[in-house]
């Protein structure tokens, strides 16, 4: 079987764009660091082309055997393609047992067919990090953080349920305590009075503000008839021509005595005439009859 059978042809279109983007992520400085590390451990020269020197899998198998003796039982020195692929497969299995995560490991074709050298480099960096974690002196990669396990007694765990974490905020200021669901009935009362049951709905809680100033007391639904009068006079409901003092001042210009548009108006002075009277038909307009409301005497 010839080696040309395993080599892919040039990529075109979208495949070429993907291959170029992967090639742009390749770090040549890290390649030099990996070269020095592998050559220092194995004692073998990789060659001018880093990936071509690793393609047969021989150096990779010897490398993992140095880090973890006995990882690869047999290293194939043959130049046959399937032997080289077998070496790469044995290396992948060995580093998996060594502790490298599966998502950090390249596939055999990424190296053998030159499809993704960036992933091969990432795998070697992950292997360096794992070797550093295990105590090997490596100048490449970063050391993985060690687990810091903590064991708590069941009583401590139960006590933690009664504590409000700072991430939940504070309960010392204004809150939604006492709020009910939208549309449900609310009972308003002053909890300082010491009453167990809420009072009637006409009682306004001090938490809702004061009802000593202007309010909407006596307001009716839109469109209904309104009876306006002065409750301080002790009178019952008067006609709608009298305006209550709660509606403002009636000493200046006002709409006092105004009626609905189109209705007759009764105009008189309440200081002199308690009830309005109208002149009879044919009677002079300016006589001094007692019931005449034009009389100003």
From Swiss-Prot:
Cite the repeat ranges for Calponin-like. 164-189, 204-229, 243-268
Give all Phosphothreonine modified positions: 170, 180, 184, 259
> What does the UniProt keyword field contain?
Actin-binding, Calmodulin-binding, Phosphoprotein, Repeat
Transmembrane spans: none
**InterPro entries according to UniProt:** Calponin-like, Calponin/LIMCH1, Calponin_repeat, CH_dom, CH_dom_sf, SM22_calponin
Name any Gene Ontology BP term: actin crosslink formation
Expression across tissues is: Smooth muscle, and tissues containing significant amounts of smooth muscle.
| GO MF annotations, alphabetized | actin filament binding; calmodulin binding
Coiled-coil residues are none
Matching SUPFAM superfamilies, A to Z?
Calponin-homology domain, CH-domain (SSF47576)
Which residue positions does Phosphoserine occur at?
175
The residue ranges of the Calponin-homology (CH) domain are 28-131
Which SMART domains does this entry report, sorted A to Z?
CH
Write out the function statement from the record.
Answer: Thin filament-associated protein that is implicated in the regulation and modulation of smooth muscle contraction. It is capable of binding to actin, calmodulin and tropomyosin. The interaction of calponin with actin inhibits the actomyosin Mg-ATPase activity.
**Assembly and oligomerization:** Part of cGMP kinase signaling complex at least composed of ACTA2/alpha-actin, CNN1/calponin H1, PLN/phospholamban, PRKG1 and ITPR1.
Q: What is this protein called?
A: Calponin-1
Q: Which organism is it from?
A: Sus scrofa
The gene that this protein is the product of is CNN1
